[in-house]
Curated annotation (Swiss-Prot):
UniProt-listed Enzyme Commission number(s): 5.4.2.11
Annotated residues for binding of substrate: 12-19, 25-26, 64, 91-94, 102, 118-119, 187-188
Record organism: Streptomyces avermitilis (strain ATCC 31267 / DSM 46492 / JCM 5070 / NBRC 14893 / NCIMB 12804 / NRRL 8165 / MA-4680)
Catalytic activity: (2R)-2-phosphoglycerate = (2R)-3-phosphoglycerate
Similarity field: Belongs to the phosphoglycerate mutase family. BPG-dependent PGAM subfamily.
Official protein name in the record: 2,3-bisphosphoglycerate-dependent phosphoglycerate mutase
Keyword Zinc-finger part of the UniProt annotation: no
Length: 253
C-alpha cells in the first residue's frame, strides 16, 4: 500500500421531489427537483474549487443519486470518469412507510414509534406488500438480485450489512489504486458507510444526519481509518444549517 492517505468523497443526492413533499421515499425511484439539481451542480463546483477531483464514482441504481453524480461531475468537468452502480448503495428500504407523509405518520403513530422506525439501528418498519404501488418486486433493474436479498423493509443495520460487501469489493479496490473516489448515494446508505468508517456506536448513529448536495471529504490511512474523523464538509456552514433541517423532518406540516 502507498503511504499517502486515500481520498474518499461522500455526496448525498440533491433534494428530491419526495424530500420536498416530506414523504418516505426508500426504494421508490423519484427524481431530483429543481432545487436538488442546483444542489448537485453546486456540489460539483465545491469539488472543483477545493481541487478535490474524483477519478471514479460509485452510485446506486436510483435516479436521484445517478442524476446527482452526473450533474456534479459535469460541473466539476469530470463527466468522463468511470461510473459504477450497485443496488447495495441504494437508500434504505422503508417498507410499508414508502410513499407516506412523515408528518402524518408522526401524528398517526406517535413520536416514540415514529422515531423508532426512522432512527433506531435495528427496528425496521412493517414490510411492504408485493402488490403495493410502491413495490419494486417487478422492477427489471433488480431482477439479478436473489429473492432472499431483495428487501421488503430495512433498518439501518440491514443497510450496513448489504452495503459493506460493496465497500470491500467495489470501493476499496479503487482506493488502493490511489484514485480519488466519489460515492454519490443516499442519506442512509451514506450513514451506514460513515458508521463503519468512524466506528460510530449503534446508539450514537441515531444522531447522525447527512445533508443533501454538500460533499463530505475523508482522508483515510492505510488501514482505511479516517485521518479526519467525521470527515470535512466542503461548505461547513451550509452543512450545519442543512443538518438542522434534516433533524426537523416529520415536524413539517
Amino acid at each position: 500500500m502507498a503511504d499517502a492517505p486515500y481520498k474518499l468523497i461522500l455526496l448525498r443526492h440533491g433534494e428530491s421531489e419526495w424530500n420536498a413533499k416530506n414523504l418516505f421515499t426508500g426504494w421508490v425511484d423519484v427524481n431530483l427537483n429543481e432545487k436538488g439539481e442546483k444542489e448537485a451542480v453546486r456540489g460539483g463546483e465545491l469539488l472543483k474549487d477545493a481541487g478535490l477531483l474524483p477519478d471514479v464514482v460509485h452510485t446506486s441504481l436510483q435516479k436521484r443519486a445517478i442524476r446527482t453524480a452526473q450533474l456534479a461531475l459535469e460541473s466539476a468537468d469530470r463527466h468522463w470518469i468511470p461510473v459504477h452502480r450497485s443496488w447495495r448503495l441504494n437508500e434504505r428500504h422503508y417498507g410499508a412507510l414508502q410513499g407516506k407523509d412523515k408528518a402524518q405518520t408522526l401524528a398517526e403513530f406517535g413520536e416514540e414509534q415514529f422515531m423508532l422506525w426512522r432512527r433506531s439501528y435495528d427496528t425496521p418498519p412493517p414490510p411492504l406488500a408485493d402488490g403495493s404501488e410502491f413495490s419494486q418486486s417487478d422492477d427489471p433493474r433488480y431482477a439479478s438480485i436473489p429473492p432472499e436479498l431483495r428487501p421488503k423493509t430495512e433498518c439501518l443495520k440491514d443497510v450496513v450489512n448489504r452495503m459493506l460487501p460493496y465497500w470491500y469489493d467495489g470501493i476499496v479496490p479503487d482506493l488502493l489504486t490511489g484514485r480519488t473516489v466519489l460515492v454519490a448515494a443516499h442519506g442512509n446508505s451514506l450513514r451506514a458507510l460513515v458508521k463503519h468508517l468512524d466506528g460510530i456506536s449503534d446508539e450514537d448513529i441515531a444522531g447522525l444526519n447527512i445533508p443533501t448536495g454538500i460533499p463530505l471529504s475523508y482522508e483515510l490511512d492505510t488501514d482505511f481509518k479516517p485521518l479526519n474523523p467525521g470527515g470535512t464538509y466542503l461548505d461547513p456552514d451550509a452543512a450545519a444549517a442543512a443538518i438542522e433541517a434534516v433533524k426537523n423532518q416529520g415536524k413539517k406540516k
